[in-house]
Amino acid sequence: MKSTFKKTLAALLLAAPIMAGASGGGHYPHVELDPRDQVSLQRGAQIFVNNCLSCHSAAAMRFNRLKDIGLTEDQIKNNLMFTTDKVGDVMQAHMNPADAKKWFGTVPPDLTLIARSRGNDYIYAYLRGFYKDPTRPTGWNNTVLPNAAMPHVLAAEQGIQAVKLDAKGQPVMKKDAHGKLVPDLQWESAGKLTRFSKDGKFIETDYNNYARDLTNFMAYMAEPAQVQRKQIGYIAVSYT
C-alpha cells in the first residue's frame, strides 16, 4: 500500500508541469522544458529582463526569488535590476502604463502567470510567430495571436519573416495542415541567431533555443514551486 501511494504521488508530481504546459490549447508545436535546468532558467531571466520587462510587469515575482535558480544577490543586483535597488521589490515594467496605452493602444498584460493561463506551447509558438505586416499599426502581426498590438522586440535575434501581399496590398492567406487559414509567410532576412543555408533553407535552431530558455523561465515564474515538486517526485521514485 505504501509503495503504491509513493508511486501515485510521484506520478502526480511529475505530471503536473506537463499538464500545465498543455493547457494552452490550439495546434502549437510542443516544447520540451526542464525546470531543473538552472543555466536555461538564468538565460531566460536575462532575456526576460532585457526585453520583456521594458513594457510588461511581473508583479507577483520578486527579484530575490531568482536566488532559487542559482543566482546570488550580487548577480541579481548587478545584472538584472535596472529600475530599483531593492532586491525584495517586484518586477515592474520600465514603461509608464499611460505611455504604453498611447503607443500600443493597450496596456501590456502582466506576465507572471501567462504560462499557466496560456500554456508553455502557446508562449513558445508566440515568440516564434511574429511576422512583418504593413496593414498593422505597429507593422507587425503574429500567427498565434492575430492582430497582436505588440511589435517584434526579438526581431534582431530571429530575423524577419513577412506576409506575402496580393495586388491590392492585402495579406495572402493559405490553409495549414489543420485546414485553418493562416498568413502565407516568407523569410526576408536572418537575425543574430538565425541564418540561411547554402541551399536557401532558413536555420533557426539557435533562436528556437533562445525562445525555449525564455519560455522555461516564464513557466518557472508562473509556478516557482514546480522545481521543488519535480525534485520531490524524483526522490519519491528513487525510494519505490
Each predicted region: which residue ranges?
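Bacterial N-terminal signal peptides that target proteins for export
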Residues: 1-10
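N-terminal signal peptide c-region/cleavage motif recognized by signal peptidases
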Residues: 15-17
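Electrostatic cytochrome c docking/interface patches
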Residues: 21-46, 57-68, 76, 222-230
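Conserved small/polar residues in nucleotide/adenosyl-binding loops
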Residues: 240
